[in-house]
Amino acid sequence: MSVKNIRNFSIIAHIDHGKSTLADRIISECGAISDRQMSSQVMDTMDIEKERGITIKAQSVRLNYKFNNENFVLNLIDTPGHVDFSYEVSRSLASCEGALLVVDASQGVEAQTIANVYIALENNLEIIPVINKIDLPNADVEKVKHEIEHIIGIDCKDAICVSAKTGVGIKELIETIITKIPAPKTDDEAPTKALIYDSWFDNYLGALALVRIYEGSIAKNDEVLVMSTDKKHIVQDLFYPHPLSPIKTQSLQSGEVGVVVLGLKTVGDVQVGDTITLVKNKAKEAIGGFEKAKAFVFAGLYPIETDKFEDLRDALDKLKLNDSSITYEPETSLALGFGFRVGFLGLLHMEVIKERLEREFNLDLIATAPTVTYEIYQTDGEFIKIQNPSELPPVNKIDHIKEPYVKATIITPSEFLGNLITLLNRKRGVQVKMDYITPERVLLEYDVPLNEIVMDFYDKLKSLTKGYASFDYEPIEFRVGDLVKLDIKVAGENVDALSIIVPNEKAQSKGRELVSAMKEIVPRQLFEVAIQASIGNKIIARETVKSMGKNVTAKCYGGDITRKRKLLEKQKEGKKRMKAIGKVNLPQEAFLSVLKID
């Protein structure tokens, strides 16, 4: 196949704007799968992707299409749409020459679309605006065209209107891809460079790398080098990606997309964004932009049954084979026993991983409240980073603390603007920009501490705006904050898993909210249980769970009052002893109550 007949493109869209359905339509229009074989969402392979309607891993498919009596190869590179996976998006887009910008005709441009379009523009991709779901009764094509032009600045007079559901406009869209998106620029004589834009683990073949060949070529049995690790491997097999079963090939030429089998044991050896080159004709430098995926959000994961600790370790090891962005290390908690402090790309990533651990490995887990990384500058000049509030040094040893900030982009119907600004101010947000896209919709940009977002910001945003606002964030920098550690004591015992780091001015109110929430959850005992919130040694709030009364005088019929008094005194003594040594078992809701406070 001549390089001039290859088109590499991806689809950019917000969740629920019909990206996976459109991909399926393009695949069936090109005849890669018969209608009978078509399962909805061919590109989404994980059950959890289909259930949540999201794309987590980038998938690819090679399609053949005849146009003007010439055969063309279309490589459709599917990208995740969610903010947590934006690094995977950037690598997928770097493998393309063009992108379809898909916008729902009834909903308009959303926040996550903007972030991904900017990545595409940075990579100088040819962008084709596609307005989807034109079959819906409330579709407003002209309004959506205006929004795309106003927010993103792309001319929409030639936008393609399609309905992925009914198939309207799909043929015209494929022909536009061929005529508008340029062929790959290649140099067959240059040393081989291949960009890994996805990798996953196969039980039979080991770690597989999905690559786009930029320069040169790779053939079966070649000795290749992974540039960031400097490790050498032999190419055992090469495939073209196909939705049903991959097609074997002897070589991959520049401009092509394919799967490379190197017989590796873990995906950590072929990380997304890395470069593969040949040992005999080594490239001088790697393709730019490679970063190791960084964890932003951390949470403790503990098995409810303490003897399942090793099972949890095995499960995390297996997930790590397929997702090199997870980080984890063992930790112990006085309240919860042995577990792991796990790092995630973001909140959705955390939910997906916890759900996969429970579903695929049959584990019952307690997750502590999510936290972020803090930079602690100590009075003795030492500098440390912590992810667990219980690691915070004593107050007298801290000079100052820095916390991570993110740039939050929100698009909301203007009727909810007042409520949203109140929420953002309460979350310590700083307004950077406010722009009316149309009289009914507003674009907001705020700098917000990441810690305020990981708790429950997304849920509150959705409930305040009846689900109409969309939200995206990207990390910017660490800034100094006036922060303190809030500890919770139950029956005099410090519950380390409930410690949180909060702004000083909110500590009092958060402490009060937390102890009153805990009071509702902690089960009543035969003795009184004090729940206290403290900063250092200072108690700032307290609630008491009253004891259950046992009627010790029930067996005294009538009789002497002194007899009853004696029994009551004895009970009082017993309760005193019990209180001193009593242990309170906290339910999972207690650990989640931290998330519910505002």
Swiss-Prot record:
Pfam family, one: EFG_C
Amino-acid positions noted as binding GTP in the UniProt annotation, renumbered to this chain: D16, H17, G18, K19, S20, T21, N132, K133, I134, D135
Cytoplasm as UniProt keyword: no
Residues in tr-type G domain copies: 4-185
Keywords noted in UniProt: Cell inner membrane, Cell membrane, GTP-binding, Hydrolase, Membrane, Nucleotide-binding, Protein biosynthesis
Alphabetized GO MF terms: GTP binding; GTPase activity; ribosome binding; translation elongation factor activity
Assigned protein family: Belongs to the TRAFAC class translation factor GTPase superfamily. Classic translation factor GTPase family. LepA subfamily.
Function: Required for accurate and efficient protein synthesis under certain stress conditions. May act as a fidelity factor of the translation reaction, by catalyzing a one-codon backward translocation of tRNAs on improperly translocated ribosomes. Back-translocation proceeds from a post-translocation (POST) complex to a pre-translocation (PRE) complex, thus giving elongation factor G a second chance to translocate the tRNAs correctly. Binds to ribosomes in a GTP-dependent manner.
Name of the molecule in the record: Elongation factor 4
Organism of origin: Campylobacter jejuni (strain RM1221)
